[in-house]
Structures are given as structure tokens and as C-alpha cells.
Amino acid sequence: MFKDYSREKFAKENFPDLSKHNNVMASHLTYELYEKYWDKVTPNGVTLDKCIQTGVDNPGNKFYGKKTGCVFGDEHSYETFKDFFDRVIEEIHHFKPEDVHPATDLDETKLVGGVFDEKYVKSCRIRCGRSVRGVCLPPAMSRAERRLVEKVVSNALGGLKEDLAGKYFPLTTMNDKDMEALIEDHFLFEKPTGALLTTSGCARDWPDGRGIWHNNGKNFLVWINEEDHIRIISMQKGGDMRAVFSRFGRGLTEVERLMKEKGYELMRNERLGYICTCPTNLGTVVRASVHLRLANLEKDKRFDDFLAKLRLGKRGTGGESSLAEDSTYDISNLARLGKSERELVQVLVDGVNVLIEADKRLEAGKPIDDLTPRLNSSTGTSISATASRHMTL
């Protein structure tokens, strides 16, 4: 601290100018909160300034939507700066400070439906993020911690058997042949260029400690140390979401079990569920999605209203910021927090069934207004427009 500066004076002089900012962090970081927390540190040395710097550096604007503007530096960041993060989380997820995320539920047998008409559903995918307990999250982790995560996770993956068995490809030693194969399969992730990851520190030391693992069937995939410690993905062509969810649950359970055998656990908060880098990715951190062809509904002005009522989001065929090719959209659940994994997959399944029915009716020249009650009664979790635009998973 500067000589002759009191704690309060330093806080006032160091408070960031957020007067022209348009992000969630800036909406909730009052001077009173900053003065309360600026000199607090987590057990790993993470400060509030570390958590908010990405939002200070990237103010956003009203034309491109409201970015999150903050990250967690470790699993203690939430509890250490609780009053601030509670406000951020409530805006993003409509999840109040007294709410509690439910227990994990990966039981595929409780899923109702989930096998779609392949005339409409071209592929199914479920992915989630997870973090290794006791290690800083990517914005604050050291090279040693990143390499430890790579070792712990890749060793666990090496213990998978039968249809989950596969191979790990470290980015640092990847040869041209393997790289070409991964690019062809659309598995390879590149160095992050987005503001959240670069200014928060997630992309430091690239590609050190990063890698990709996939099973021999190429329908179960794991990214290590991209935005989060672990990204687990189950996918396949066609309309069998039940099979995708079953494989996802088995793989996720086995990876966690194999890690525990070596003395490592996943980060999980009693109130918020699983913890990852961005406050948008809490709870289940699950994004279930389909590539869905809607040649008729896409032309109807009610398309976006249907999606909103079903609590679903849409992207182009190639993902975020891409266009739909051959009327095919990436449709996914918006919520991450407040319901179990199985419940969120059910939200997607129910919603996709409604969208397919609407498309069929429009093709036949039939009305779709009577589907509205089904939309209003559909299961799901409310989530803000902020989260719908900025879920990074």
C-alpha cells in the first residue's frame, strides 16, 4: 500500500472507472463492495481485482449484448467475494442466494423419449466442464498446476475400458499426422482469441499442458486445459440422444472414479454445484445440443418465441456466430444451474419434440398456435438473456 494511504483511501484511488461499461460485473461492482473486498485474498492468493480484470479491460457495449466480465480464480473465489458473486449469479441464472443446486443425476433410464426422427435431427451432443479440486482455475493457475491437471486427467482417461478406451494427444508433442486427423474430425481446439480467455489469463503459456483425448469410436472426447481444466463431450450422428446421454454419464462417472483412486476430486460447491472458470458455467455445466433441420419453422416469425418459451438457444450449424446451413441449427438448453443433468437433457428433448411437431404442421399447412400451452408447461429453468448469449460451453 502507498505510504500514508489508509485502507479506505487506497480502495477509493484503486476503484476501476466503470462508468462506460456494459457488462454484468460493472452492473454489480459498487464502490462499497470493492472497498469491502479489494484487499481480501483466497487461500491461493486470488484477489477480487484478478477476478474482475477481464471485465475492466473489455467494457462491452449495448450493441453486442452484455458480457459477463468476471471469472473465478479458484474454488474459493465465490465464498471469499460472496456478496459480489451472488449478484452476478442471480442476474445470469436467476438463482437467488438462498437457492441450492440439486444433486447429480445421470440416470438415463429416467429420461422420457430422446430418440428423434433423423429427418430432422442430424446429430446429438452433450458436453460439460469440470475442475480439479485443490488447483487454481485457468485464470490464476501456474504452469506447474496446469501440468499437474494434464497429468491427473490424462492418467485417469488412460484407465477407461471397452467402448470408452482411447488415446491422449498432447498439443506440445502432436505430430502433423495426428493434427491433420484431429482437424478432419473437428476435434482440435485452437489457442483462444476471445477477450474472456485472453485478458483473464486462461491462454497463458499456450500450448503447454493442453491436450485432446478421444475414445477409439470417436464419440467420447475430452479437452484438457482449454477454458476449463476438463471438457467432457459425448456425441454421435443421428437422433439417439438417449445413447449419447448414457455414454456421457458412464464416461463422466468413470473419469471421476479413476481420479479419486489417485486422490483427486472435482470441484463442487454445496450451493452452486460444479465450479468452472466463468460464472455462466456453474451447477451441471451441461450443454446438451442437437443439429436440427427446421426448413419451415425457420421462416416463421414465431420461431424465436418458441425457443424462448422452451428455454432453448440456437446457433448456426458451425456453432456460435455462424450461419445455419441447409436450415440446420444448433439447438441447446440455456440453463446450467438449478436442475440436474438429466432434467436439463429432458428440457432439450421435450423442446426439440415441440419444434419438430411445429415444423411438420407448418409443412402440412396446419396451425401451430395450440402448441403454446405445451410451451408454457414445458419443464426448464429460467435464465437471463445475458446467460443465453454468453454460455461458453
UniProtKB/Swiss-Prot annotation:
A UniProt-annotated Pfam family: ATP-gua_PtransN
Origin superkingdom: Eukaryota
Gene3D superfamilies given in the database record: ATP:guanido phosphotransferase, N-terminal domain, Glutamine synthetase/guanido kinase, catalytic domain
Catalytic reaction annotation: guanidinoacetate + ATP = phosphoguanidinoacetate + ADP + H(+)
Residue sites binding ATP per the record: 123-127, 186, 231, 287-291, 315-320, 330
GO BP terms in the entry: phosphocreatine biosynthetic process
Region forming the signal peptide: none
CC terms in the record's Gene Ontology section: mitochondrion
GO molecular function, one term: guanidinoacetate kinase activity
Protein name: Glycocyamine kinase
Keyword Transport: no
Annotated segments matching region Disordered: 367-393
Alphabetized UniProt keyword annotations: ATP-binding, Kinase, Nucleotide-binding, Transferase
